[in-house]
């Protein structure tokens, strides 16, 4: 029997409507692709068992959130408790790339993370299967953005052709697990501090 601890990792996928968030989620979890997905209202999630670095077992919840502005307010309620945030843009859509920083900032405002400076993000430039003439966002521009936001890992992907999706989500799982463990340790430290303060108070309040 394995003694390995199983963790539940929550991963949020953000980005403009139509960049391929739902397609990426289904490609990774189910290894399937469809062009018939409807716009996500609020949020939806799928789960997948993952093994990180060969010996760490976890259940990853991949949350797909609304990209359309009229549905965004429904999705922010699901940001809290996230262990990693994936920011997706479409390499054929300049505005979706320009909005990456806004999505990151919105997440940090609503997610209430313990340490915004160190919280893990991953950027995915999707639809690299598109014809070269239709690609607008260069890899260099994406690398510069990723660096400016704190050296965020960047992957160019194709949900349609299953390019780089598994590799990207391996990094996402690793980052999420590290964040999950850091949050757990911080909670345990705070809990132990609270217990020690209470015990010290009881010891100092003796009756004379």
Swiss-Prot record:
Compartment(s) where it occurs, according to its Swiss-Prot or TrEMBL record: Late endosome; Vacuole membrane
Motif (Effector region): 37-45
Topology of the protein relative to the lipid bilayer: Lipid-anchor
Effect noted on mutating residue 157 to P: Reduced nucleotide affinity leading to increased turnover between GDP- and GTP-bound states without the need of a guanine nucleotide-exchange factor. Suppresses the zinc, caffeine and calcium sensitivity of CCZ1 mutants
SMART domains xrefs: RAB, RAN, RAS, RHO
Family annotation (InterPro entries): P-loop_NTPase, Small_GTP-bd, Small_GTPase
Modified residues (Cysteine methyl ester): 208
Cellular component aspect of the GO annotation: cytosol; fungal-type vacuole; fungal-type vacuole membrane; late endosome; mitochondrial outer membrane; mitochondrion; multivesicular body; vacuole
Example GO molecular function: GTPase activity
Lipid-anchored residues (S-geranylgeranyl cysteine): 206, 208
Residue numbers binding GTP: 17-23, 33-40, 67, 126-129, 158-160
Official protein name in the record: Ypt/Rab-type GTPase YPT7
Gene this chain is encoded by: YPT7
């Amino acid at each position: 029997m394995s003694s390995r601890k199983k963790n539940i990792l929550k991963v949020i996928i953000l980005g403009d409507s139509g960049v391929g968030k739902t397609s990426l989620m289904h490609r990774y979890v189910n290894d399937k692709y469809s062009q018939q997905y409807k716009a996500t209202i609020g949020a939806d999630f799928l789960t997948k068992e993952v093994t990180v670095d060969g010996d760490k077992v976890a259940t990853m919840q991949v949350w797909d959130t609304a990209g359309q502005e009229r549905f965004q307010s429904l999705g922010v309620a699901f940001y809290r408790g996230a262990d990693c945030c994936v920011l997706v843009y479409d390499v054929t859509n300049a505005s979706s790339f320009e909005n990456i920083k806004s999505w990151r900032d919105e997440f940090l405002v609503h997610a209430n993370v313990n340490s915004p400076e160190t919280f893990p993000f991953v950027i995915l430039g999707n639809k690299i299967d598109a014809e070269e003439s239709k690609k607008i966002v260069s890899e260099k521009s994406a690398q510069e953005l990723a660096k400016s936001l704190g050296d965020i890992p960047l992957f160019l992907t194709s949900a349609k052709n299953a390019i780089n999706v598994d590799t990207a989500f391996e990094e996402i799982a690793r980052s999420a697990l590290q964040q999950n463990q850091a949050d757990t340790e911080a909670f345990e430290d705070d809990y132990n501090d609270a217990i020690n303060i209470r015990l010290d108070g009881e010891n100092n309040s003796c009756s004379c």
